């Protein structure tokens, strides 16, 4: 069992026992690029932490060049926004590959593709993805000539899902990523998303059939969650939890890493039952106000949504088609439910949400 952790600015940063997923991704990286990979899972299940661990600690820095484009927290509404996220402008009179070689000596990944100022101005002026993709491909080919394997990782890709530049930008990106992987075998591509509705749309997209694959980063199963509690209790509280205490924590928050961390941290100043009841009460209030807003606008919709949620009183996970498509898509979009398109199942985003549903309805 591997335990990997660090302290940054006094905060405990989670990373724990994702060896199965790490092994799968490292195996992909060792082969030739041939598919686009979508890394998905419930909210706060540890997707970004997993990728960060691989970038920072698991790959050979002399062999790979990683471009990690994080769209989280960035407002993208127009072409210029997209370009500014994708590229890093520089003014030196050097080739992009030379800039890249100098930068990767000090950092594990680059947050944008280095681009000379005059080139970036031309790209912005023409407003066409053709020039963008051509430039990126040339940079990636230069990296390959240097004996290194490029990797592109885009976090929260769904943020550009509705953006149009001569058609939907997302489809142009998909086509380009397929070209980089399945056609040219030039660059590994990973797309991260916690938006399971977006993943379902990708999964159903005919143009991507046999060109993409999926890696699920789910909340911990019970066995791993209990071991994670042992690990955190030793590190944060300098003591062990009893089996009953761990079972109680799991019954409230399940295997959601961030919620387990929150519980253990609060135990420094509060009792366990008080902490768990407080967290559940907070989740119930959020759900109550969410349903109240719906009821005020449309009582018929409220009744349908309440009926759908009541199905979870007996089961944590159900077949997706048990809930009408428009209702399930609404609940997934609002992050009440998580959809797994590969299994065709729905479940609450966390045990905490599940407990709130059971007690409120």
UniProtKB/Swiss-Prot annotation:
Pfam families named in the record: ATPase_2, MJ1010-like_2nd
Signal peptide location: none
Keyword annotations from UniProtKB, A to Z: ATP-binding, Nucleotide-binding
Coiled coil: none
GO terms of molecular function: ATP binding; ATP hydrolysis activity
SMART domains attached to this UniProt entry: AAA
InterPro entries named in the record: AAA+_ATPase, Archaeal_ATPase_domain, ATPase_dom, MJ1010-like_2nd, P-loop_NTPase, WH-like_DNA-bd_sf
Annotated residues for binding of ATP: 41-48
Recorded family membership: Belongs to the archaeal ATPase family.
Protein name: Uncharacterized ATP-binding protein MJ0439
